[in-house]
Each structure stands twice: as C-alpha cells, then as structure tokens.
Amino acid sequence: MKREAFIKVVEEALDSLPEEFRSRIRNVAVLVEDLPPHQSPPQAGQPRKLLLGLFHGVPTTKKSVFDLPRGPDHVVLYQKNIEAVCSTEAEIREQIRRTVIHELGHYFGMDENQLKDV
C-alpha cells in the first residue's frame, strides 16, 4: 500500500473513534514509519513477532504537574510490519484500527492485560 493510502486509513481509524476519545487525544500525534529502528525488513516465511506500533510518552494516569517538559506524546505505526502480518487490504485496514486503539490504550494508562479485553 502506498504511504498516502496507508495514512488515509490511519486517519479513518482515528475519525471512527467516539468523540469522547477523539477530544482527549488531540495532542497525541500519530506517525507512520516503515520499520522500528534497528529492525531489518520482514522476510516472507519467517514467522516472528513484529512490532506493529509503539506509544511514546507518559500515560495520562502517570502525568503530573511536576513533570519536566518533554516532546509531545505520540504513537508510531510501522507500515511494513503491519503489511507483513496481513494478506489483504481489508486485513490491513482492520490491523491499523486495532493497532491505533491498542497504542492509544497505552496513552490512557492501560497495560497489556487490560488491552486484551478491548
């Protein structure tokens, strides 16, 4: 999928979130990169866990007025890894949505066990 099309699907996933969540993530940037740093491109036929996305920042449950200024909170989606675990465009769309929701869950302070229920 071309980067522009991938970004459009990410935007659609964000737009599909309920307003009560969208209003709380206005300051969270969602970025798209090919791969995580230091990862070689995924190879066909080599099953392994691939990092699909990552939240960078401080969860809302841990923020304090005493925190030192940092860069903005953001989510990075790794396009090549998402595409590698999907077979069709429909699967890519669904995986983007699931990954966006998962990483934003970390922004809201949810851990991996809590996110399994989402």
Show which residues each predicted segment covers.
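Active-site rim/adjacent substrate-binding subdomains
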Residues: M1-Q95, Y107, D111-K116
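Short alpha-helical catalytic segment bearing the HExxH-like zincin motif
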Residues: Q95-E103
